[in-house]
Regions:
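N-terminal alpha-helical interaction blocks
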Residues: 1-85, 153-224
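Short, flexible coil/linker segments at or flanking structured domains
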Residues: 78-81, 93, 117-118, 140
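Short metal-coordination and nucleic-acid-contact micro-motifs, chiefly zinc-binding Cys/His arrays
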Residues: 83-89, 123-126
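Conserved binding-pocket/active-site segment within a compact domain
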Residues: 103-194
């Protein structure tokens, strides 16, 4: 839910990047001896996720607990997106996402080529939502308005992999990004590809949706 809204609104998702937030200098990125992948020269425990993948750093525009700055609608903030996906929190308000016996509440854009098994196994970098903000998203998110929104209840949103940048050793012995064209640039890298994950700098966490039920958002009511 990071595309430009079709109507003016104060609603800005927590995961949306803001003007003034800056990516960390790549001069802090280096290579482990023996061609064993990437690391930060001043690496800390939060720089890697639980699967050991290194994450892109980015400053945060905060005033107390409030995220400030004009939204960059088409971009997400790496650590805020990761936070919501890891903890399955609402991507707008960071509170508990909606969950019932049918599972967590996710939104997806309607597709013209939905596979035979429906949305089972769908990969998403969009964190779940609470019911209030799911309803706001289908009205305000330009991409969902144009394509049409599908409401999904998901029993098992499995950790799948990451979106980001693959690196290799450059001619000067320093990390060099591998360039990809088209959809390949945003294709998730599965965690199971352990030969590549040490060379990956992640910017979005991806889950695989299992136990999926398509529901009508208008029929959903707040949990008791």
């Amino acid at each position: 839910m990071t595309n430009t809204p079709v109507t003016a609104s104060r609603l800005v998702p927590y995961i949306t990047a803001r003007h003034g937030e800056q990516a960390d200098s790549l001069s802090n990125l280096s290579l482990r001896p023996g061609s064993k992948g990437l690391f930060y020269l001043d690496e800390g425990p939060r720089d890697r996720d639980e699967r050991g993948v290194l994450w892109a750093r980015c400053s945060q525009s905060r005033y107390g607990n409030e995220i400030t700055g004009r939204p960059r609608w088409r971009e997400v903030h790496p650590s805020r997106q990761r936070e919501c996906m890891e903890e399955l929190r609402c991507q707008v308000c960071v509170q508990q996402s909606s969950r019932t016996a049918l599972g967590y509440l996710f939104l997806a854009a309607q597709q013209t080529d939905v596979p035979a098994d429906g949305w089972e196994g769908h990969l998403t970098a969009q964190p779940p939502l609470c019911l209030e903000h799911a309803k706001a998203a289908v009205e305000q998110c330009g991409h969902l308005v144009r394509a049409g929104a599908v409401t999904l209840r998901v029993r098992v949103p499995r950790l799948y992999g990451v979106i980001g940048t693959l690196y290799r050793t450059g001619p000067d012995g320093e990390p060099e990004p591998v360039e990809f064209d088209g959809e390949s640039a945003t294709t998730p890298l599965p965690y199971k590809q352990r030969q590549l994950t040490p060379w990956f700098l992640a910017s979005q966490l991806v889950r695989e949706l299992r136990g999926v039920t398509v529901v009508d958002l208008d029929d959903l009511v707040p949990a008791a």
